[in-house]
Amino acid sequence: MTPTLLSAFWTYTLITAMTPRPNNILALSSATSHGFRQSTRVLAGMSLGFLIVMLLCAGISFSLAVIDPAAVHLLSWAGAAYIVWLAWKIATSPTKEDGLQAKPISFWASFALQFVNVKIILYGVTALSTFVLPQTQALSWVVGVSVLLAMIGTFGNVCWALAGHLFQRLFRQYGRQLNIVLALLLVYCAVRIFY
């Protein structure tokens, strides 16, 4: 990979990992509501699911030309529906202000999110088909970059969870407002899948 292409790869992956997306918003919300330690299950589920999805993206990238466009479109709708459901759960979740506390999202729920999270699927397919496959079709490189993509995504999730933890007091004071803003950001993510 040339230095220019490598620079573009890092720019794309880091910006994509750090900008708001369903995983980051969920990590922020979980750490704000439950603290970083309680959010480790959510982060672990995301990380494992993310890795598996990136490895699946490696396989998809090899055969992208033969994928049925209707199947990709159906996956987009399923992902958008799940993201909107997640937005609803966050918007309506109890806050400290309400005197109630929702349970943290489970490992398996955050794991399952990855398989309908169109944003990370597009992230993986785009990175692999743009930066890796034109340079090499060696399976070891494709798998290695898939693992790297999952690590970069996990880094973004952890950064957002740490922000939620660090600003927990402020966020808890304005919990209802924060939940609504986070829910609206998730709805925005769902809409951006199509536009």
Curated annotation (Swiss-Prot):
Pfam families: LysE (PF01810). InterPro entries: LeuE-type. Keywords: Amino-acid transport, Cell inner membrane, Cell membrane, Membrane, Transmembrane, Transmembrane helix, Transport. The keyword Translocase does not apply. One of its GO terms (molecular function) is amino acid transmembrane transporter activity. GO terms for cellular component: plasma membrane. The chain crosses the membrane at residues 47-67, 70-90, 105-125, 142-162, 177-194. It catalyses: O-acetyl-L-serine(in) = O-acetyl-L-serine(out); L-cysteine(in) = L-cysteine(out). Belongs to the Rht family. PANTHER family: ARGININE EXPORTER PROTEIN ARGO, ARGININE EXPORTER PROTEIN ARGO-RELATED. Exporter of O-acetylserine (OAS) and cysteine. This is Cysteine/O-acetylserine efflux protein. It comes from Shigella boydii serotype 4 (strain Sb227).
